[in-house]
Amino acid sequence: MTNYRVESSSGRAARKMRLALMGPAFIAAIGYIDPGNFATNIQAGASFGYQLLWVVVWANLMAMLIQILSAKLGIATGKNLAEQIRDHYPRPVVWFYWVQAEIIAMATDLAEFIGAAIGFKLILGVSLLQGAVLTGIATFLILMLQRRGQKPLEKVIGGLLLFVAAAYIVELIFSQPNLAQLGKGMVIPSLPTSEAVFLAAGVLGATIMPHVIYLHSSLTQHLHGGSRQQRYSATKWDVAIAMTIAGFVNLVMMATAAAAFHFSGHTGVADLDEAYLTLQPLLSHAAATVFGLSLVAAGLSSTVVGTLAGQVVMQGFIRFHIPLWVRRTVTMLPSFIVILMGLDPTRILVMSQVLLSFGIALALVPLLIFTSDSKLMGDLVNSKRVKQTGWVIVVLVVALNIWLLVGTALGL
């Protein structure tokens, strides 16, 4: 009886510790369902039905492994990826990495900020510029939570992630997809045209986020409680749950677009405004409203995450710190410029996701090198299978990007 109580008590303690360590992956996961995903997934689903769902499945599995490696680096070394690059690489390489990481972070924030502004425009009937102002105010308010520590921010962003997931369950019910075709699209690879390759690269860029690779290692580098192995075990659960939710949202997003638009003849829907307006007569006003609300939630939470990632990148690479409100103000400017110039916001969203896909390999290569170094990682060093899988992911990403560049240059 005594042994049972001891085991029960230790089991409760282990569960309590796992719960206490939950959260960092939810902040990372929100980057995987930002408005860039909305734009790319809607275009892919409307244009090609269920044919590109397999890209989402494999990209999400890759993302799970990548985020586990990023989190593991922080746990094992007490330093984030940017700091490790700074400590191990020559200064010119470090400065190159910092510049490209800042560009990637700003491209990400552009997509997220404009996406939230579009969401406000759709559900409130305001102008895009007014939506951008509302987005700026809302993100400043959310960032103020950082003053109270990481946990309050994790709870708010985790709540927004769950809201977006719930919203897309509702959208799935409204759209009534063909489950047999949906399942086929998830498991059978298909890239029927050069446009499909372009969108596949965009889906990859929208699903595997370079800036979140840097951020996640910083969120776990100061975790406390239990042994390193226990913290790593809890982190794997954290990543598995958060990334499964994010992957589900991306799948449902593309499947909903396929069911609602592609199979009703609206294959040219490539604009978030058009998607919202088309949903109203096809499904219902409620479905369109849920779409708008989920876009706002995804945009607000992911633009906050983008701001945090930019801060980590700057501090890690060049040891320079600026207040979060200053960074938020500066990174809002490109979004306002795009809006004031009257550029197509949805096209900007998709292009930003393609740009992101070029930053994945640059973040992945050092991540794999560091996490495969037994001197750095100790007992958390990568296994041979993980190393091999990681390099396969790098090769796939680079190959897809080369295919995209050649196809674009030749006008294929």
UniProtKB/Swiss-Prot annotation:
GO terms for cellular component: plasma membrane. The chain crosses the membrane at residues 20-39, 52-71, 96-118, 126-145, 156-175, 197-220, 239-258, 277-297, 328-344, 351-370, 388-406. InterPro entries: NRAMP_fam. It is a multi-pass membrane protein. GO terms for biological process: iron ion transmembrane transport. One of its GO terms (molecular function) is metal ion binding. Residues 1-19, 72-95, 146-155, 221-238, 298-327, 371-387 are cytoplasmic. It is found in: Cell inner membrane. Signal peptide: none annotated. Keywords: Cell inner membrane, Cell membrane, Ion transport, Membrane, Symport, Transmembrane, Transmembrane helix, Transport. Its main location: membrane. Residues 40-51, 119-125, 176-196, 259-276, 345-350, 407-412 are periplasmic. Pfam families: Nramp. H(+)-stimulated, divalent metal cation uptake system. Belongs to the NRAMP family. This is Divalent metal cation transporter MntH. It comes from Shigella flexneri serotype 5b (strain 8401). The gene is mntH.
